[in-house]
């Protein structure tokens, strides 16, 4: 473990990002940048360059070893939201509502979502279409901002038969468009569009006043989101078609770890510069 704690987060130099700011940027045509983060260190890394930080339930398959997001619990999400919030990010902090935390009844849903705001989030994100309208309306009525999520919704992986592009059939495309309009009318301040054809996402973006955030939805959305580990190349193996990897983070980290192991085994680490000297008076007393 480190011999000293992380330094406290420095106060942001620019004002915090707010929901009205995102909506104004959408009207101005300024693209919104959103990434995931799951702890304070990640939040400090991304905060200077992004507009929105999503504490996604993707933490389940990215960090916790699950095959999908379904096993992620409310307690797990609370833990990670608290960790990110401790970094005091300037970016808008959005917390994912995990599976079965907004499906059963409205009082529990409001309590679960409100708990995220009490832990430092500014908004929540939830998956689903028209069936979620009563949930969105109830949350918005309680002053809990909601970001919707349509298209390839990972919590529906079993119903969809896998992680498959949505909206390629006429009826499905029409339903996604209609769901987007209904979620906007219900009070969502933004929508994530995942895994749908680029032209369909463009049509939805044009039809809505609120910003759309794309992931695997082409270049015409009001903003884009990627999992941080994907864009930094921190996960080995096959990537989704929509992922662009900007650096071989996995390779760089492996090289650093290999150099550390080599230095330890060769007796080169730690050296004098990483060691503490014994005061002369103490040495004399011990002799």
UniProtKB/Swiss-Prot annotation:
Binds 1 Mg(2+) ion per subunit. The keyword NAD does not apply. HAMAP family: PanB. Catalyzes the reversible reaction in which hydroxymethyl group from 5,10-methylenetetrahydrofolate is transferred onto alpha-ketoisovalerate to form ketopantoate. One of its GO terms (biological process) is pantothenate biosynthetic process. 3-methyl-2-oxobutanoate binds at residues 57-58, 96, 125. SUPFAM superfamilies: Phosphoenolpyruvate/pyruvate domain. It catalyses: 3-methyl-2-oxobutanoate + (6R)-5,10-methylene-5,6,7,8-tetrahydrofolate + H2O = 2-dehydropantoate + (6S)-5,6,7,8-tetrahydrofolate. This is 3-methyl-2-oxobutanoate hydroxymethyltransferase.
């Amino acid at each position: 473990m480190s011999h000293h704690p992380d330094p406290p987060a420095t106060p942001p130099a620019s004002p915090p990002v707010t929901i009205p700011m995102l909506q104004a940027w959408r009207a101005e045509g300024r693209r919104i940048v959103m990434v995931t983060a799951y702890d304070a260190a990640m939040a400090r890394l991304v905060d200077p360059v992004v507009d929105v930080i999503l504490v996604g339930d993707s933490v389940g398959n990215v960090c916790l070893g699950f095959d999908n997001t379904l096993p992620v619990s409310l307690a797990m999400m609370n833990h990670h939201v608290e960790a990110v919030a401790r970094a005091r990010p300037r970016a808008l902090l959005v917390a994912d509502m995990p599976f079965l935390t907004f499906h059963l009844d409205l009082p529990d849903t409001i309590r679960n979502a409100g708990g995220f705001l009490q832990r430092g989030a500014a908004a929540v994100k939830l998956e689903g279409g028209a069936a979620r309208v009563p949930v969105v309306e109830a949350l918005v009525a309680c002053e809990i901002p909601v970001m919707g999520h349509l298209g390839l919704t990972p919590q529906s992986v079993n119903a969809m038969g896998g992680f498959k592009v949505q909206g390629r059939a006429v009826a499905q495309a029409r339903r996604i468009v209609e769901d987007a309009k209904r979620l906007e009318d219900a009070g969502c301040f933004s929508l994530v569009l995942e895994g749908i054809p680029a032209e369909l996402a463009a049509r939805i973006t044009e039809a809505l006043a609120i910003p759309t955030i794309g992931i695997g939805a082409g270049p015409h959305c009001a903003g884009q989101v990627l999992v941080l580990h994907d864009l930094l190349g921190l996960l080995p193996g096959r990537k989704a078609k929509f992922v662009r990897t900007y650096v071989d983070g996995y390779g760089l980290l492996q090289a650093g770890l290999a150099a550390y192991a080599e230095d330890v085994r060769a007796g080169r680490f730690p050296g004098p510069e990483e060691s503490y000297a014994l005061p002369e008076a103490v040495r004399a007393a011990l002799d």
